[in-house]
Amino acid sequence: MEIGLSLGANMEDRLKYLIQAKQQILALPGINLAAQSPVYETEPVDVPPEFQNIPFLNSVLIIETLISIHQLMRFFLFIEQKIGRVPTPVSNAPRPVDIDIIYADKLQIEEDHITIPHPRWPLRRFVVQPLSDVRPELQIPGQSVTVSHILTQLQDPSRVVLLTKTW
């Protein structure tokens, strides 16, 4: 099963945290890397005003696995916590790393704590740009057009600047 992951970081050594997350994801048995996007520096989106001046680094990983979505979610939460993310009552507060599942093949899941595809992915340039780099012709369930087409029509004016192609 092909899974698209969005990785983000906006605390301290952001690139180091993205690299650690990638390494820990790929160290899990049964996970293979199919593609990775460049890393972009991006403006914060949907964060409280006091965090508006803290830019993110964002990227996308495409993995192949037979591991269940629920097990993957547990793995990713463990990795986030291991890298230093702590629960906070403040929504979208700064974090060392955030790992979100954008899509999982053609699956559509809507449960208490899991919605796949991610409901806000097509609205966020910090997800759509790196996803378009690695899967431009992909049509994710719930969308009638490709990722690259969504990018050309995106209304999100936030800044997305290439930081590095290799990481």
Language model features by range: what are they?
Residues 45-56, 67-73, 78-167:
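Flexible, gly/pro- and Lys/Arg-enriched active-site loops
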